[in-house]
C-alpha cells in the first residue's frame, strides 16, 4: 500500500470554507481517481508540543491521506493527477491554504 499525505496549513477562520471545499469538490474527485483505494481527512492535534512550537495557536493543520494500491499508481498519481487537483485548491484559496505533499510506502510489520 502506498499513501500520499497532503498536509494543509490554514488559519482557523478558514476552516469552514476549506471543509466545505474538501467535502463537496476535492475529496469526491480524489475518491473517483483511478488507483485510489481510500481518502481520509485528519486534524493534527494542537496539543502536540512539536505542533505548538511550529505554529501559532490560531493555525490548523489538516492531513489529507490518499491511499493507493500500487507503486505505478503512486508515480502516475503524483506526476499527473494530484498536481491538477492541488492546482484547483490553489486557484480557490491562494495563499490562505498552504500545503506540503509527502509520498509514503507502507512497511509490513
Language-model features: locations:
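Short, well-ordered beta-strand segments in beta-rich or mixed alpha/beta enzyme
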Residues: 2-9, 42-80
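Generic detection of intrinsically disordered/low-complexity segments and helix-coil linkers/edges
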Residues: 9, 15, 68-71, 87, ...
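Short amphipathic alpha-helical segments
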Residues: 14-44, 81-91
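A general secondary-structure boundary signal
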Residues: 25, 39, 63-67, 102-107
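Terminal low-complexity, poorly structured segments
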Residues: 26, 70, 74, 82-85, ...
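Glycine-rich beta-strand-turn "strand-cap" elements at beta-sheet edges
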Residues: 40-57, 86-109
Amino acid at each position: 500500500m502506498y499513501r500520499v499525505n497532503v498536509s494543509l496549513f490554514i488559519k482557523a477562520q478558514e476552516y469552514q470554507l476549506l471543509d466545505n471545499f474538501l467535502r463537496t469538490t476535492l475529496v469526491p474527485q480524489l475518491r473517483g481517481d483511478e488507483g485510489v483505494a481510500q481518502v481520509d481527512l485528519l486534524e493534527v492535534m494542537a496539543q502536540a508540543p512539536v505542533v505548538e512550537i511550529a505554529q501559532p495557536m490560531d493555525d490548523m493543520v489538516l492531513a489529507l491521506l490518499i491511499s493507493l494500491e500500487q507503486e505505478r499508481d503512486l508515480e502516475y498519481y503524483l506526476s499527473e493527477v494530484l498536481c491538477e487537483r492541488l492546482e484547483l485548491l490553489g486557484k480557490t484559496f491562494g495563499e490562505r491554504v498552504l500545503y506540503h505533499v509527502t509520498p509514503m510506502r507502507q512497511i509490513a510489520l
